[in-house]
Amino acid sequence: MPNDRESGPSGLSPRELERYKRQLILPGWGLAAQARLREAVVFVAGAGGLGSPVTQYLAAAGVGTLRVCDSGVVELSNLNRQLLHADRDVSHPKVRSANRTLRRVNPHVRIVPLEAVIDDHSVEALVGDAGLIVDCLDNFPTRLVLNAFAVRRSLPMIHAGVTGYCGQITFLHPPATACLACIVPEAPPPEVFPILGATAGLLGCLEALEALKFLAGGGTLLTGRLLFCDGSTMQFQEVAIEKDPRCPVCGRR
């Protein structure tokens, strides 16, 4: 991080104030909201098609610490949608190129690259002191592990998923809302699915927007609502989702 901390009461340096000035004039934003972003710690699960736009926009907006977790290596077939990575990164860990790219996006942000598998044993240490989880994963078994941890710790989690031209997104914060297991009780069988880079970009940007609204304290979140996006027809549909009292993960909370 650059050492230019001649800051005012907000804790933001002159360079940071200049960097963020266009969002600082948003109605209801201001220095207080920007300072909240600067103090925030966000856990981003996945540095791929969704994680690329999520982490870049959170870094650009000035979120203080991003814990970016991915166990995979960059493959050539990733590069149509995973803009954190480039040709030179093929066969190397995704978190390595993610760390390099995000530091270029905003040197004021702390990046914690975590090359690890998320499972029942590792999830607590990986999430660490994050106050928000952003699900940018591409497999449901790991999503459900992350969801169960979020429920136990009462942590908010933003979920999104994409396939082809389509995607979905919601904001989960049990016990006030349903959890992911209320919506998808069991992991569907694994498959290789088609995906267009722009679809992942769209849903990732929506996840970043939800995260920034939550952290800054403005706007209406997608709590209790699942937003479906069909890029092939440009139709957006919202459905209400309710907590399942019989859910084995959150039903008794």
Language-model region placement:
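Adenine nucleotide-associated cytosolic modules
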Residues: 1-253
